[in-house]
């Protein structure tokens, strides 16, 4: 799947758009005329949102049979409606560092679709975050949530804030400033954010504390991913990583095999990657590589999950710290984790990872 990332280097969106025209990026001739016009109008409306274009194009490609079976969807402009968010919120997030210097970041919440229930989707804190990426993720969240059978709509949010290298106090102040604006737009029956890249249990706790302070109400349902001591759910931390492996196990079973004895590579080393690694190894696989934004580690003896948790969750270190404490592991800052030979690849870091 092609995407906006080449290795670890983020490409400037305007330059990428100028490099080639739309016909070279997305072959609209493969879409039926009705969907082709929907996509072309979307691109004309938001010409530089390439990540969002990609998500919409891929969904529209799968809807071709539906167009012929349900012509009334065209009459009701269903495809136009589903590709336009119900609401897009962008806001300023000022915060002070430990030296008293003021910084300003940009916050986002795209409430894409609430046809099935309250908006639901994570918050991402990462310097690459922009409106296109949030719309990309929010659009896909509509369909992911609908497949659960639960009454949930689709949304996504976040900020172009980099939590790496920040103290706990700095992250707390940022989260408090972020929630001071976000709280106007969310609620248990309106929009229920969760965590994502850069937003774990610590950040959710800071966000929930500020929401509770401003609203003077203990609305436990306003955020998911909270700690068990203030209304969180058992196994919430493990759920995404475990779920990935359970799905992959079913895919392997359909091909007459299983994780047992497989050599596995897992990108990332955050919440999803750690628990995907744990579950894959419980099912008999050997996970030989994990990564973070600084590089990747290869451990032919199999990733030591407890050491990985200690490095990344408790000490919030770099993946190189794992290699420094594990004689069987080697760290590389060059190349790609996808160059490591494996039977199964589990992308757990960000969107559009696979080359």
How would you name each of these model-derived features?
Residues 16-234:
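N-terminal ligand-binding/catalytic initiation module
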Residues 181, 185, 274, 348-349, ...:
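Transmembrane alpha-helical segments of multi-pass membrane transport proteins and ion-pumping complexes
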Residues 6-13, 19-21:
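Acidic, Ala/Val/Gly-enriched low-complexity intrinsically disordered segments
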Residues 227, 232-338:
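Glycine-rich phosphate/diphosphate-binding loop of Rossmann-like nucleotide-binding domains
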Residues 108-109, 158, 190-191, 220, ...:
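Structural motif
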